[in-house]
Amino acid sequence: MIWLMKYLTIFLLLLLVHPQTLAADHCAVLQYHHISEDTPGITSVTPEQFQQHLDYLLQNDYAVIPLETVITALKTGAELPDRCVALTIDDAYISAYTEAFPRTVRYEYPLTVFVATEAVDEGRDGHLNWDQMRQMHSKGVSFQNHSHTHTHLVRRLENESPDDWEQRVAADIQTAQNRIQQELGVTPTLISYPYGEYNEALKLVVISMGLTAFGQQSGQIWQEADFTSLPRFPLASFYARMRTFTKKVNSLPLPITGACPLDPVVPLDDWQPALMLIFNPDVENIRQLRCFVNG
């Protein structure tokens, strides 16, 4: 059966913030791919847009924090500063070096890059090389796992058993772990799923490897989140405009205690997938809730 990631793009945001709060238990993680005017719009912001984003964060006193620091705080119950933001880039495209890197260094903003290591090893056009990453790493940029091959990890090959799939996927992720450690001298603790795709079986693989994982679904991360499928705000094209950017960084986490179904992968022929969310009974401002679904 052909499987497809269930991109409902459930854009569930509580849009009011509490300006009197000086500490928080949540953070907005921003996701970029290309920072260029010459790459596909669906995965790109222009250098001008990226600059506008950084300027907004600076001018409005956002605390831009290393992603690993955010995760440690959330897992241990430590407080985060109000208006917490973390910057991430997926795929290690060359614009991470030419456009993002000099700007984040200038602003003294930490940056995390999720690397699909096969593309780097093969020297594919438009990607970083290891020397560039070593230079970035020396200035504090964190490099994390994005798998080795950047394939659709949730999909089984033809006639592939569940056990064989698990071994193949674990080996793919471990290869990326090894290559980053060999080249940069650090062992990743984080992974972002290629294409944001995950299912319950893949989450179990990630758990067995001791990794914290991110998807591409929108939302703030917080202390009660699932650390095998943390949300990020994808920024590209229309969704990188300042009007939507400001809403994302000013949102609050969605306080749910459960969801059904747990597995976000559905058959391709399922045209009416359903999602049930169970809210924390103590949630405030429930009337502020908005739901936007691609359809």
Residue ranges and their predicted role:
Residues 235-269:
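Short, compositionally biased P/S/T/A/G/V-rich stretches that sit at domain boundaries
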Residues 21-85, 249-263:
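N-terminal pre-catalytic segment of deacetylase/amide-hydrolase enzymes
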Residues 256-295:
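Beta-strand-enriched, solvent-exposed domains that form extended recognition/catalytic surfaces
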Residues 175, 180-183, 203, 207-218:
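Catalytic-core region of carbohydrate-active enzymes that cleave or remodel glycosidic bonds
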Residues 25-40, 60-63, 80-85, 93-95, ...:
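Metal-dependent polysaccharide deacetylase catalytic core of the NodB/CE4 family, i.e.
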